[in-house]
Amino acid sequence: MSQVELQHILWLLLAIGLEIIANIWLKFSDGFRRPVYGVASLAAVLAAFSALGQAVEGIDLAVAYALWGGFGIAATVAAGWIMFGQRLNRKGWAGLGLLLVGMVIIKLA
């Protein structure tokens, strides 16, 4: 799969966006005490996996999954910081940095 088409990249971007939305809605669900957000979160995860399934038709699985997971985590950290005032400590930032370095290495492999 050397030829990655724009449609597969767009599917991957959609999967990443849905993953982020699912995580935010999961936080809003307050441990499923607010079931509308909980159910919406589950639906967003299902949609994210469906979009990822379309993306891997044109992007190698390891690359697509690493990008999906890595960008999803990084953006969720940012959303937690901006929306909920959650902060990472030094170890958390180091882990996020290692994750991003790992994504680059996988992409270059």
UniProtKB/Swiss-Prot annotation:
Pfam families: Multi_Drug_Res. The keyword rRNA-binding does not apply. GO terms for cellular component: plasma membrane. It is found in: Cell inner membrane. It is a multi-pass membrane protein. SUPFAM superfamilies: Multidrug resistance efflux transporter EmrE. Keywords: Cell inner membrane, Cell membrane, Membrane, Transmembrane, Transmembrane helix, Transport. Gene3D superfamilies: 1.10.3730.20. The keyword Ribonucleoprotein does not apply. Forms a complex with MdtJ. This is Spermidine export protein MdtI.
